């Protein structure tokens, strides 16, 4: 149910100055997963060129519940989806102060089968009027962005017979032409579903047995083909942790979804399939979590498990098939999608904390331009005891791009600034964010020169302006 604030966060003195300032002309929203253009890039300027020893000015900090989803910001509102006790909570705050505007809570019994936290994984999607969220158990919500009142709700797990996913629902919804596109992961042919964004009614559903049965298992040894097993939902789980991508290729609009089995292109209006491409690890208990990188007619897929590596695909004229451009182990990305800048990918590669590396890779060729070890020392796991100092590495960091700089958050809360440079690593500064602790798996969010960071306990706001 929706409820008003006040739930006051700790507000620092910097807030007093901030409140007196009008929103600058360079103000920009970050209304959904991967930002305003869905590519981790912001058009904002006037950002700091380095990080001072004491860090940028703290604007506010706010205690929140469990979850891995990033907050979203639109029209002065920040929305964070988190879990406290046995409730998932969608909470809207004033982006400048952190003060709660409204909350909507609903029951959740989700327990992660692998021992990770039980909070939501998907980032809220904000429009001018509405807030869309997808919870860990597959509850799809549309709320009024002003009041927090429920507009409609769907229980995707029940409505579409979804097998239990490895880590809960983790593919953020996107909006395309009035349709909310969701990777539901259902049997038999409801891996991807389009909902009417205004009403929540199902418009189309596709992807499953008819997509994959009989197709070549590209990248696997021998000449194997897919034999879809209706009786083994464990093997035929469809949901991955990649968010759908909407792109125009050769003049045709595509919804590109990397499911657990591989890449599928769908017509956004009808859900009809254009092409599919098998891409997954040979081990059962694995998923693909990196959202594809799309540029022109090229699509990059990557997976960190068991030498699956990466493949760059080119969509052929007509939009009905693809061909491989390169394939290799240059990138084995877990979930932190690379940033593409001037033909170069800036990426954190590696499955676990000890084998994390920061790399610059040429998008078109796969050539590695530079590489730096960012793994946790001594092969240790990243979970730290209370008071223990975090290692001075980024691990599997998450990056965004703004004002000609990469803003990186490491998975134990190390904040870094880098200048994109294919010739060498050009680090502008680093600082350990005091509130952030492992696991910091939500990417940074930038709106109106304010940087929003989230871990399992806090959302913090820092002034990143010059």
Predicted regions span which residues?
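Noncatalytic, solvent-exposed loop/strand surfaces
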Residues: 27-466
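Intrinsic disorder/low-complexity segments
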Residues: 1-10
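Sec-dependent signal peptide recognition
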Residues: 10-17
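Hydrophobic h-region of N-terminal signal peptides that target proteins for export
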Residues: 18-27
